[in-house]
Amino acid sequence: GYQDMKSEYQKMIAGEPYHPFDPELRALSQTARQKQATFNEEVDPVKGLEIIKGWFGSTGENLYVNTRLVVDYGVNIYLGENFYSNWNLTMLDVCPITIGDNAMIGPNCQFLTPLHPLDPDERNSGIEFGKPITIGKNFWAGGGVIVLPGVTLGDNVVAGAGAVITKSFGDNVVLAGNPARVIKEIPVKEN
């Protein structure tokens, strides 16, 4: 029936196997490359942020993204209010990447949603899939943090420089290492 007629884009954002060379996805990717190039060459940060606001799935009113941004599509990125990112932010958004209010992202951080089949024949066939990344409010990532596909983080999470976050964690924790683990609980004042 009609339910079987999902587009490759719909399959992709749902985390189902999809063909990345689908014409609709190629066109979306090409548009993203053009916007990425325009943003990365823009010297005026106000103009740069207008590009991001008109491109990403959603953003807060107040945000700052430094240049050397790399994304797959951009349209699957949802940022809360007061988002800040330093240089070289990579967000590979084949599935949605959602980050809550007041995020501070250090340089060279990567948010990676794409996955490939482990079986070599399946992988070589070109089929891909992904898993979304969802992060709560008040996230602080030091330099070089990597967040892998399918990770959900709660509120008030701090990730130390170089942390590789391979699985989900709750609220009020400091993560460090590869693979990242909780090295400290954060005592939060009751409002």
Enumerate the predicted regions with their spans.
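Acidic, glycine-centered active-site loop in nucleotide-sugar glycosyltransferases
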Residues: F169-D171, A176-P179
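Arg/Lys-rich RNA-binding interfaces used to dock onto structured RNA substrates
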Residues: K53, T67-V70
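Conserved catalytic segment of ABC-fold P-loop ATPases
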Residues: G154-V157, G170-N172
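Terminal amphipathic alpha-helical/low-complexity segments used for targeting or macromolecular assembly
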Residues: G1-N62, A180-N191
